[in-house]
Amino acid sequence: MSGINGAGPSNFFWRWRADDEPVTERERDSSSGANLTNSPQLRPESPTVSGRRLLRSNALSRQTREWQETTSASAERATPPVEPRQPPEAQPAERIVAERIVQELVRAGANLNNVRTMLRNVMDNNAVAFSRVEWNILLQHFPDMHTNGISSDSVLANELRQTLRQVVHQQRTQRALAPILSPAPSRPVASSSRSSQRTLLGRFTGWMAPRQTSSSSQATSSTSVDRHPQDLNQLESLRLADAERRNRSANQTDTDEALRRLTQAGVDMERLSTSLGRYIHSFQPAPPDLRRLLESVGIDPDIPEELTLVNNPVLNLNVALNRMLASRQATTESSSVFPSRAGDTRVRTLPVMPEREDNENNVAYGVRLLRLNPEAEVERVVEAFITDPSSRPEVVADIHAVLRSITSQFRQLRTISKADAESQDFRDAADYPDDPTSCLFGEDLSLSNPHQQVIGLAGESTDILQPYSQEGNKALRFMDMKKLAEHLASKPVHPMNRDRLDDKNIAGYAFRVVPD
């Protein structure tokens, strides 16, 4: 078969040979130093590459340039451009639901910044600390949150985080740019007010802004001067604090109502306190009859393993119950002494004194009695169940040693100022007698109480050389370190994230609150 000959641009000779045509000696010699592109064995790689090689010559004819431009343009048209991948956007329905959730949170007086942080934590499987109002609102839209958490791939959750981020940023910007209130506030312009209400952020800004009121004397006199103007930031902080206080008050009201109904039903409060304490500290479920009673007053007797103990109805009821039993201490002490059962010479000198479990030794039983009787000293607790006076000092020493392994580290803990603690919702009982912060396990907290070791327990551990960081340590829960030691003596479990917590790693979690 004869070969196919042709002339390329600038009369450059191209020759394509048939497969069965032999290679002549001249072709072999001429192609030994030739480029592989012009080899009779291979077809050109591409017109574009061939054109680039042709550019190396010193002189190119007009035909060559036109041929190169034509082939380059055809190659570009043959390859469609790759469009950049656009990120998936939330559907309008998801945005509407997210905006509605934020509206509900604002109306309820929730701390949007805290909700945003805790929402991120629950999506990252970290410890959370929602208020009851926040929890109920989110649970309506994420019904599986209490068992499965919230997936990081949830479109609604991510849209809610984005909306919260925008609203919080808008609030911070407004606070930073807000002027001092003038003595005679001017009437807002109607057009600007309407335009600000058109957007979601404008509506939230209008809801979160404090209401400005003036007395009748200020309304009638335009020359009156307010010599004590208040910052908008301070007014908004007060409004948010009042809303959070109302939420806590509502939670306390529900707990008090449940406790009142249990009392009217004739429930043995000492037995109930023992069962709740055993469940909280040792995860032993309450008896069936007490579980039914708790459910009848609206309290779920179960705490899922995924949930934190903080702000849990069972824990709130236990705190209120311990306070009520402690108030009966004087009456109980003045009552007659009697044995608890036949053959038992134990003297009931404690307000709350349940029966000893079969597997409890003297130290474990003594620590449990300390938890149930916050006002009692170790010596008095031991005297209540150790009948042999000569055996009491050893038991007292053993209990002190167990508790001291935790409490002895109090002075070596990293510190956090009282002002920084107040930014984390700490309220000293000496400064807020009507609404103090209660210990996770009982009484109200105060830095002026010499019998307390007030600490903030973080949800995440950090190096002991690093100061407190909300990003690294997460939120703080304030408590008495002595009461925490009693809890850890029975069950060395972190009350907020269920991880192990003992004397070896508590320094990474705890911060000592110090006066300013």
Swiss-Prot record:
GO CC, alphabetical: extracellular region
Keywords per UniProt: Hypersensitive response elicitation, Secreted, Virulence
Main location: secreted
InterPro entries, alphabetized: E3_ubiquit_lig_AvrPtoB, HopAB_BAK-bd, HopAB_BAK-bd_sf, HopAB_E3_ubiquit_lig_sf
Pfam families with a match to the protein in the record: AvrPtoB-E3_ubiq, AvrPtoB_bdg
Biased composition (Polar residues): 31-41
Location(s), subcellular: Secreted
Disulfide feature: none
Expression triggers: Transcriptionally induced by HrpL.
Single GO biological process annotation from the record: symbiont-mediated perturbation of host programmed cell death
Biased composition (Basic and acidic residues): 16-30
Region: Disordered, residue numbers: 1-93, 175-259
UniProt biased composition (Pro residues): 81-90
Keyword Translocase included in the entry's annotation: no
Function according to Swiss-Prot or TrEMBL: Effector protein that plays different roles depending on the species and plant cultivars that interact with the pathogen. Acts as a virulence determinant by enhancing the development of disease symptoms and bacterial growth. Acts as an avirulence factor by eliciting hypersensitive response (HR) and plant resistance.
Family: Belongs to the HopAB family.
The protein, known as: Effector protein hopAB1
Gene transcribed to yield this protein: hopAB1
